[in-house]
């Protein structure tokens, strides 16, 4: 929407994602042939077992954006997301991720347009933003929920089937966050015959979702933890000719 020299654009939305996975299988033992058809027909039918399973995940999101433009010279944008993931415990299910950017089209200023005719475009921009990550390296679906394994144990000379908690659970698990910083310049010369774009960036990931080793004598698997940080810095440069 435009109001004289001012232009404002607004966007708001919501998203609901649900994923369901199911599998079924049949197992037989005793085959000794490399021929698949022959092997299946000669397998021990009494050893046949069927199995099935699956899992479900869900994510709910709300998001919004506002863009402001004054005389095509001064630009501002703000974004905000709120995401909830079923992978995290209820107390940390929601993550909130803002982002901001601003730009100045120096080439639209009168003191440039009237005095530097060979400069077609000059824009300075600055950005900061934060996003979230819910993925574990092992693609663990329920890192904050107790899971159980099955086995056998001898007791009083008899063999019993058992179920036991296979790992510790971290009820403080939360979103990993990725924070981006960017400073850039865009320039075009001689009616944009030639030009370049240069961006300096810094990307920092905090509270990475990892499994840190624990002592084997504990007898249970390691819990997922927010335990890592990574930082990357660099630049991107592109040069063009039309």
Annotated model-derived regions:
Residues 1-242:
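Extracellular/periplasmic, surface-exposed regions of secreted and cell-surface proteins
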């Amino acid at each position: 929407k435009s109001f004289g020299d001012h232009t404002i654009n607004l966007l708001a939305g919501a998203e609901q994602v649900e994923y369901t996975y199911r599998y079924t299988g049949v197992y037989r033992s005793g085959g000794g042939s490399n021929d698949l058809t022959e092997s299946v027909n000669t397998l021990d039918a009494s050893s046949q077992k069927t199995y099935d399973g699956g899992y479900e995940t869900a994510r709910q999101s709300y998001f919004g954006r506002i863009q402001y433009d004054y005389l095509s010279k001064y630009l501002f944008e703000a974004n905000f997301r709120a995401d909830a993931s079923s992978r995290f415990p209820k107390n940390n299910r929601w993550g909130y991720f803002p982002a901001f950017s601003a730009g100045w089209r120096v080439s639209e200023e009168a003191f440039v347009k009237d005095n530097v005719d060979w400069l077609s475009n000059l824009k300075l921009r600055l950005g900061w933003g934060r996003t979230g990550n819910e993925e574990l390296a092992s693609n663990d679906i329920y890192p904050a929920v107790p899971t159980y394994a099955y086995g056998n144990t001898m007791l009083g000379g008899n063999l019993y089937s058992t179920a036991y908690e296979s790992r510790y659970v971290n009820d403080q698990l939360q979103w990993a966050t990725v924070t981006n910083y960017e400073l850039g310049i865009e320039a075009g010369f001689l009616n944009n015959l030639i030009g370049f774009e240069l961006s300096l960036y810094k990307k920092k990931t905090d509270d990475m979702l990892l499994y840190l080793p624990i002592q084997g004598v504990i007898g249970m698997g390691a819990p997922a933890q927010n335990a890592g940080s990574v930082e990357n810095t660099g630049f991107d440069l592109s040069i063009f000719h039309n």
